[in-house]
Amino acid sequence: MAELACFCYPHLENDSYKFIPFNNLAIKAMLTAKVDKKDMDKFYDSIIYGIAPPPQFKKRYNTNDNSRGMNFETIMFTKVAMLICEALNSLKVTQANVSNVLSRVVSIRHLENLVIRKENPQDILFHSKDLLLKSTLIAIGQSKEIETTITAEGGEIVFQNAAFTMWKLTYLEHQLMPILDQNFIEYKVTLNEDKPISDVHVKELVAELRWQYNKFAVITHGKGHYRIVKYSSVANHADRVYATFKSNVKTGVNNDFNLLDQRIIWQNWYAFTSSMKQGNTLDVCKRLLFQKMKPEKNPFKGLSTDRKMDEVSQVGV
């Protein structure tokens, strides 16, 4: 995750801003600079290579002292920065909202996946600039629309019905922030269309998740899609979701956290996110992840939780 201000800077033209991508030499200069504390939140002028991000975002970049940041000296960084600028330049951003726009925290891996989709001749985003723009605006939080199947970050499709598409996510070969853990496995479920869904199609998804992905928890980050993650990674997701939610509240970003369908979401996660929306502390919310919940009535007839061991999936073991 990183703020949009890590990729580009605003240049005032008439009454609105044009956004320009950073080059990696300017960022490199900023990372070596000694900056007064009062100037940490200001864009840095590298003198030689142009404008660089505010020094307060130093930890967002991979350096000898910080391996957890993004690899900004890659071609992919430039491609992602240009993708963001193209999207922002399609909007009218004024002095009143430029700060809020640039403080928006976005998913670096999601944006890299959009670049990968854009460069794939078999993908619809390769052929449609309008759809690519729409997908990018959603990814950077500048659209009220949710991420649906056609505007999704992409991946390998492992399940699809009339209402949902399930993607296997892999970041092993990413350039900006690869996940090199060979055991990493995660999925995302997007809605094919943002409209009411038939119980029949919900039941099909629930059955698929229950029998094929029983080692995973179904959660949401509040953005209109489901994530299927290992139970061992749930606490980490909770920390990230809570931090992003609080950051958005603090900066005044419109943050309509979508709890999604309670019949699909893991019961403990639904309790966690509901508590978070009520304004409780992280500790109070996270306790709900580890509490034994009272089993809910099965909303779907004929979908039993009783299953023989040889019928239970080994995915994620």
Swiss-Prot record:
UniProt KW keywords: ATP-binding, Host cytoplasm, Host-virus interaction, Hydrolase, Magnesium, Metal-binding, Nucleotide-binding, RNA-binding
Effect of H225A: Almost complete loss of NTPase activity. Unable to induce NSP5 phosphorylation
BP-aspect Gene Ontology terms: viral genome replication
Obligatory cofactor(s): Mg(2+)
EC number: 3.6.4.-
Pfam families: Rota_NS35_C, Rota_NS35_N
Region described as RNA-binding: 205-241
MF term (GO), any: nucleoside diphosphate kinase activity
Chain residues that bind ATP: S107, I108, R109, K188, H221, G222, K223, R227
EC class name: hydrolase
Transmembrane segment boundaries: none
Annotated effect of mutating K188A: Almost complete loss of NTPase activity. Unable to induce NSP5 phosphorylation
Top-level division of the source organism's lineage: Viruses
Family listed: Belongs to the rotavirus NSP2 family.
Function: Participates in replication and packaging of the viral genome. Plays a crucial role, together with NSP5, in the formation of virus factories (viroplasms), which are large inclusions in the host cytoplasm where replication intermediates are assembled and viral RNA replication takes place. Displays ssRNA binding, NTPase, RNA triphosphatase (RTPase) and ATP-independent helix-unwinding activities. The unwinding activity may prepare and organize plus-strand RNAs for packaging and replication by removing interfering secondary structures.
HAMAP family reported in the protein's UniProt record: ROTA_NSP2
Protein name: Non-structural protein 2
